[in-house]
């Protein structure tokens, strides 16, 4: 492939790619060499493919060359500092001067990073991953055996199989197996453009002859990979959209049902409010009743506790009283015994006193008689002529108590008896002596 042809292939491919990205911001280009020269759309493009915000201030409508160069310099610094992509041999002036070769090389570097390096199949990535993806996607198609970019795609069967696998309703693959390679390649490019949206970048004759360089083949084939991925993403979005539509339909039905029952709900709401107010009133009354009941229970428990303590105190006092009663009963029994003993003693003393009184009376009588006898004897006695006996006795006992008087009189009587006995004995002796003398 001549250098001019390669530029055409790249220009078509990169224009389509850049426009697919810029479309998200409502922008587009028609000439990659001219439309990126002021740096504005290049900055937008770099933001979109990287997902990073361009934070530097730049001129959105540069008129002078210096302003364009400043924008482009900021874009290249963003590419190197933020996106960590080093691009050799190109400067801001190359964009301003519309250096197509340098610009295409720049875009190829970006394309490899963001469109080829991201391809992954099995344990392979980049170009090898793309080749393995082609092999796996075309498995089962007659005559297709993907081994390399430079040899596999020359007969057109591989591209035709990729186009057919994407949408089998477009054509019958078997109808093209017997056609010549150029016819198959042209058919594949046509179906790829119609069915996959892959622009016709290659010439069938050059591909069949093997003069198309490998980079062009890689670039064109990568468009198939991304078309498949876009289809898968679209199917996922459609599934999500369908699911969302179902949910929206369900929500709409729910809203309609809710709309129909709105008045009923309002009525129920009012009824519930009334019921809630009633329940709140009942709850307040019930709470008040429970508080009063709790207070009464506390009072009852307090009274029961007081009664229990009083009962315990009463039981303690009764126990003490029973002990005191037993002691008193014992003391009473002892007192009664003592009383009986004293009464018996008093009775005995009374009887004894009566007997003693009677005896004393008799004794007094005997004493009086005896005193009379003594007096008589005294009168007879010669020794006692100086004073009378009774006056002496009366004088001696007049100041003494009765008992002492008795003792004193008894003593006197005993002394007198002894004196009388002695006197009688003396008289008897005298009488005996006189009798003896008279007998002589």
UniProtKB/Swiss-Prot annotation:
<keyword id="KW-0677">Repeat</keyword>
<dbReference type="InterPro" id="IPR015383">
    <property type="entry name" value="Cortexillin-I_coiled-coil"/>
</dbReference>
<dbReference type="InterPro" id="IPR036872">
    <property type="entry name" value="CH_dom_sf"/>
</dbReference>
<feature type="domain" description="Calponin-homology (CH) 1">
    <location>
        <begin position="8"/>
        <end position="115"/>
    </location>
</feature>
<feature type="coiled-coil region">
    <location>
        <begin position="227"/>
        <end position="355"/>
    </location>
</feature>
<feature type="coiled-coil region">
    <location>
        <begin position="403"/>
        <end position="436"/>
    </location>
</feature>
<dbReference type="Pfam" id="PF00307">
    <property type="entry name" value="CH"/>
</dbReference>
<comment type="similarity">
    <text>Belongs to the cortexillin family.</text>
</comment>
<dbReference type="InterPro" id="IPR001589">
    <property type="entry name" value="Actinin_actin-bd_CS"/>
</dbReference>
<protein>
    <recommendedName>
        <fullName>Cortexillin-1</fullName>
    </recommendedName>
</protein>
<keyword id="KW-0963">Cytoplasm</keyword>
<dbReference type="GO" id="GO:0003779">
    <property type="term" value="F:actin binding"/>
</dbReference>
<dbReference type="InterPro" id="IPR001715">
    <property type="entry name" value="CH_dom"/>
</dbReference>
<dbReference type="GO" id="GO:0005856">
    <property type="term" value="C:cytoskeleton"/>
</dbReference>
<keyword id="KW-0009">Actin-binding</keyword>
<comment type="function">
    <text>Actin-bundling protein. When linked to F-actin the actin filaments form preferentially anti-parallel bundles that associate into meshworks. Plays a major role in cytokinesis.</text>
</comment>
<comment type="subunit">
    <text>Homodimer; parallel.</text>
</comment>
<keyword id="KW-0175">Coiled coil</keyword>
<feature type="region of interest" description="Actin-binding">
    <location>
        <begin position="1"/>
        <end position="227"/>
    </location>
</feature>
<keyword id="KW-0206">Cytoskeleton</keyword>
<dbReference type="Pfam" id="PF09304">
    <property type="entry name" value="Cortex-I_coil"/>
</dbReference>
<dbReference type="GO" id="GO:0005737">
    <property type="term" value="C:cytoplasm"/>
</dbReference>
<feature type="domain" description="Calponin-homology (CH) 2">
    <location>
        <begin position="124"/>
        <end position="229"/>
    </location>
</feature>
């Amino acid at each position: 492939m001549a250098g001019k042809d390669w530029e055409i292939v790249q220009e078509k491919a990169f224009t389509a790619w850049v426009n697919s990205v810029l479309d998200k911001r409502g922008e587009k280009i028609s000439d990659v060499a001219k439309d990126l020269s002021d740096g504005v759309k290049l900055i937008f493009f770099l933001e979109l493919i990287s997902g990073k915000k361009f934070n530097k201030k730049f001129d959105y409508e540069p008129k002078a060359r210096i302003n364009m160069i400043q924008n482009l310099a900021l874009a290249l610094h963003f590419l190197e500092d933020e996106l960590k992509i080093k691009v050799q041999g190109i400067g801001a002036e190359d964009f301003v001067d519309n250096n197509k070769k340098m610009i295409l090389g720049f875009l190829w570097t970006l394309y490899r990073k963001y469109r080829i390096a991201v391809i992954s199949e099995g344990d392979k990535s980049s170009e090898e991953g793309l080749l393995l993806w082609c092999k796996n996607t075309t498995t089962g198609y007659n005559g297709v055996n993907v081994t390399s970019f430079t040899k596999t795609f020359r007969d057109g069967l591989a591209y035709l199989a990729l186009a057919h696998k994407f949408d089998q309703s477009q054509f019958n693959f078997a109808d093209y197996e017997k056609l010549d390679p150029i016819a198959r390649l042209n058919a594949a490019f046509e179906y790829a453009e119609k069915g996959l949206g892959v622009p016709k970048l290659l010439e069938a004759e050059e591909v069949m002859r093997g003069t198309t360089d490998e980079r062009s083949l890689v670039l064109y084939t990568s468009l198939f990979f991304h078309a498949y991925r876009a289809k898968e993403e679209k199917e996922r979005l459609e599934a999500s959209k369908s699911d969302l539509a179902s949910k929206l339909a369900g929500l709409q039905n729910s809203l309609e049902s809710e709309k129909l029952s709105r008045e009923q709900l309002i009525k129920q709401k009012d009824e519930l409010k009334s019921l809630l107010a009633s329940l709140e009133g009942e709850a307040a009354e019930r709470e008040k009743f429970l508080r009063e009941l709790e207070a009464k229970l506390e009072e009852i428990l307090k009274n029961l506790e007081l009664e229990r303590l009083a009962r315990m105190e009463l039981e303690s006092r009764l126990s003490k009283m029973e002990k005191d009663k037993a002691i008193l009963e014992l003391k009473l029994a002892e007192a009664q015994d003592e009383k009986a003993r004293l009464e018996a003693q008093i009775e005995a003393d009374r009887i004894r006193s009566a007997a003693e009184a009677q005896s004393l009376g008799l004794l007094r009588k005997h004493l009086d008689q005896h005193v009379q006898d003594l007096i008589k004897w005294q009168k007879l006695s010669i020794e006692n002529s100086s004073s009378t006996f009774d006056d002496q006795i009366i004088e001696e006992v007049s100041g003494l108590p009765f008992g002492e008087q008795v003792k004193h009189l008894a003593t006197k009587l005993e002394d007198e008896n002894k004196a009388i006995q002695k006197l009688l004995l003396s008289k008897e002796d005298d009488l005996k002596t006189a009798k003896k003398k008279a007998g002589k």
